[in-house]
Amino acid sequence: MSSNQQPVVLGKLGSCHGIKGWLRITAYTDSVEGIFDYSPWLIKENGEWREVKVTQWRYQGKAVVAELEGVNTREQAQMLTNCEIAILPEQMDALPEDEFYWRDLIGCEVVNTTGYNMGIVDQIVETGSNDVLLVKANAKDSFGKVERMIPFVPEQFIKTVDVQGKQILVDWDPDF
């Protein structure tokens, strides 16, 4: 299964809430309640993904808690604490042709406008002003770099993104 076919992690199950099997939810979606737009969820338990359905959810103070189908006791819920919550990639909304998900950029080759291969996108970091590509440099990098941090600022630094071809063209000095 390719990385784009792997489940997309949207959050994590937290600690138990009460005695009836409710769990706190940590959501990585833009809005906390956005995680509940997807059903069913996949829960990674003991290294294996299994399908679960949310029967209900609510705000509990500043936290969000949910009841999962088949989880009726505190003991059952405790077994799920810290399990990842994911969905299948096909459950995600289709995007317009010129847009992409951050996960699609992981593994893309980064080349600058002079043709220099800067490396491969390893991860993306959110900052207050703009997101930043963490690019793992090639083993034989001419500038001795191990990693580069390139601000994801379209037009200024990011010239083109070719998700199908797995390549990002940047206007960035390889010595930075």
UniProtKB/Swiss-Prot annotation:
Name the principal localization, coarsely classed: cytoplasm
Subunit structure as annotated in this protein's UniProt entry:
Binds ribosomal protein uS19.
Q: rRNA processing among the record's keywords?
A: yes
Q: Does the keyword DNA repair apply?
A: no
Localization recorded for this chain is: Cytoplasm
Q: Which residues form the PRC barrel domain?
A: 97-176
Molecular function (Gene Ontology), one example: ribosome binding
Single Gene Ontology BP term?
Answer: ribosomal small subunit biogenesis
InterPro entries per UniProt: PRC_barrel-like_sf, PRC_RimM, RimM, RimM_N, RimM_N_sf, Transl_B-barrel_sf
Q: What is this protein called?
A: Ribosome maturation factor RimM
The record ties this protein, via NCBIfam families, to:
16S_RimM
This entry carries the following GO cellular component terms, namely: cytoplasm; ribosome
Q: What is known of its domains?
A: The PRC barrel domain binds ribosomal protein uS19.
Q: Which UniProt keywords apply?
A: Chaperone, Cytoplasm, Ribosome biogenesis, rRNA processing
This molecule's function is given as: An accessory protein needed during the final step in the assembly of 30S ribosomal subunit, possibly for assembly of the head region. Essential for efficient processing of 16S rRNA. May be needed both before and after RbfA during the maturation of 16S rRNA. It has affinity for free ribosomal 30S subunits but not for 70S ribosomes.
The text of the family note is:
Belongs to the RimM family.
Name its species. Shewanella sp. (strain W3-18-1)
